[in-house]
């Protein structure tokens, strides 16, 4: 087993007229809390979006649990257990409390060859979370209806 859960090596990402990442490196150990810090425009969000499959790296590689992997989409990242909280995240008033909590990472189930959102699990898990946090909020309530 690798010392690191996730390693990003030599990551290069360019946008028109801007080299956002110039051979960036990242090593994450299992069971450790890490902070990725830097000035505005340093490339922190760009690196995370490359890790999560939102941006395609121009160069570089990702190793996950000691194996070289390709993460072309956020769904591929989620299937590997990699998640990301986006700094631009905005709540959606027309969706329920549960839908906002699980936005972009809904629990799913298979019905034959089709994968669908597992609404029962989503609401049950949300209710358990709200209870644990001692919040008396209806998980089915539209976010815009709350004050």
Predicted regions and their residues:
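Glycine-rich phosphate-binding loops of nucleotide-dependent enzymes
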Residues: 1-147
């Amino acid at each position: 087993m690798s010392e690191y859960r996730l390693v990003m090596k030599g990551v290069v990402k360019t946008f028109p007229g801007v080299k956002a990442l110039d051979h960036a490196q990242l090593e994450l150990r299992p069971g450790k809390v890490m902070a990725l810090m830097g000035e505005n425009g340093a490339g922190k969000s760009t690196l995370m979006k490359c890790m999560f499959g939102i941006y395609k790296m121009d160069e570089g590689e990702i190793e996950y649990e000691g194996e070289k992997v390709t993460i072309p989409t956020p769904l591929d990242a989620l299937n590997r257990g990699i998640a990301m909280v986006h700094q631009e995240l905005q709540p959606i008033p027309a969706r329920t409390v549960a839908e906002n909590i699980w936005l972009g990472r809904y629990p799913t189930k298979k019905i034959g060859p089709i994968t669908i959102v597992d609404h029962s699990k989503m609401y049950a898990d949300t209710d358990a979370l709200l209870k644990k946090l001692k919040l008396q909020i209806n998980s089915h309530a539209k976010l815009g209806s709350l004050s």
